[in-house]
């Protein structure tokens, strides 16, 4: 039974979130949609929503939290986990490194000048495309099934692809094709180029909402343990490695700034989503001391491809509630 004091605290948290979402929504006009993917260019960029999930299942939601959007680069987290589960961490890291890069997420430069062909990390396009080729199965559908099964295991519902977004990405994936063929030439891509691209772009086009990614964040916050179901759904080693990569590489080439000023493991996508998490804290006087998962949606993105109002909202929350892991 929830105590009255807990209800009161959660009510205060909801009031704060509503105020902060309303405030930072006004900054959406300073961002832009990811118009290089035509289907994303049509989205209303004034939207902003958030969902916070606590270990007891309590959810605090505000703004446009329920609006569906595509995972885009947040799917790189899922793909990496799925590959590690099926191939093992050591095998995966032979083909993708774990080093941050200051280049844009779709850059090809470092593939040519450092360890030719080996992607720096799985949170950039080159790394995620390589990961897509490592997924179990011999067909596009079989490889995607490992993604679907993993997501369903965590959020308890079967994901679906937004076919309009997928077709839009498929028709404009020229840079990703260049990356894939370069990776294939250097022996890091295990599957056919076009099939691998289809897997990658379809996983990016999976549709979710802030509640879904907040649940995934909650599981990662607890090292792969699902505190609501009281079940270990991911190996601890995989969850911890994933969080480390999110912290160092998850926010494109703004990852260092994000770690310095917000201080949480996170992964963003150009659709405007941000999946982040707060590990449990040793200081029990702090807000969310038992950890939580956070999902944010704000499709107005900045020059790095991250949600502009979403990052501003998250930075405010992290400061007000002292959420940084540092």
Curated annotation (Swiss-Prot):
Superkingdom to which the source organism belongs: Bacteria
GO biological process, one term: glutamine catabolic process
Catalytic activity line of the entry: L-glutamine + H2O = L-glutamate + NH4(+)
Pfam family for this entry, one: Glutaminase
GO molecular function: glutaminase activity
Record keyword Protein biosynthesis present: no
Assembly mode: Homotetramer.
Protein's UniProt name: Glutaminase 2
Gene that this polypeptide is encoded by: glsA2
């Amino acid at each position: 039974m929830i105590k009255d004091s807990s209800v009161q605290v959660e009510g205060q948290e909801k009031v704060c979130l509503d105020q902060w979402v309303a405030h930072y929504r006004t900054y959406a006009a300073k961002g832009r949609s990811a118009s290089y993917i035509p289907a994303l260019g049509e989205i209303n960029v004034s939207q902003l929503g958030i969902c916070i999930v606590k270990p007891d299942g309590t959810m605090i939601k505000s703004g446009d939290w329920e609006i569906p959007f595509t995972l885009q680069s947040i799917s790189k987290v899922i793909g990496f986990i799925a590959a590690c589960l099926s191939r093992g961490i050591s095998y995966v890291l032979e083909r993708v490194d774990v080093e941050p890069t200051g280049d844009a997420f779709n850059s090809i430069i470092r593939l040519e000048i450092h360890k030719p062909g080996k992607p720096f990390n799985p949170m950039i396009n080159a790394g995620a495309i390589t990961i897509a080729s490592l997924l179990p199965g011999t067909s596009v559908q079989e490889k995607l099934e490992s993604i679907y099964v993993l997501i369903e295991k965590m959020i308890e519902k079967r994901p679906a692809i937004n076919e309009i977004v997928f077709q839009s990405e498929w028709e404009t994936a020229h840079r990703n094709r260049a990356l894939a063929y370069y990776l294939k030439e250097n022996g890091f891509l295990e599957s056919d180029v076009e099939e691998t691209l289809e897997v990658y772009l379809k996983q990016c086009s999976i549709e979710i909402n802030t509640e879904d990614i907040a649940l995934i964040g909650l599981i990662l916050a607890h090292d792969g343990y699902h505190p609501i179901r009281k079940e270990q759904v991911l190996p601890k080693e995989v969850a911890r490695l994933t969080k480390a990569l999110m912290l160092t590489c998850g926010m494109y080439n703004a990852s260092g700034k994000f770690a310095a000023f917000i201080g949480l493991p996170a992964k963003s996508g150009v659709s405007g989503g941000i999946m982040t998490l707060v590990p449990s804290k040793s200081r029990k006087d702090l807000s969310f001391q038992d950890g939580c998962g956070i999902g944010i949606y704000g499709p107005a993105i900045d020059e790095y491809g991250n949600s502009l109002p979403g990052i501003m909202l998250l930075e405010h929350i992290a400061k007000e509630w002292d959420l940084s892991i540092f």
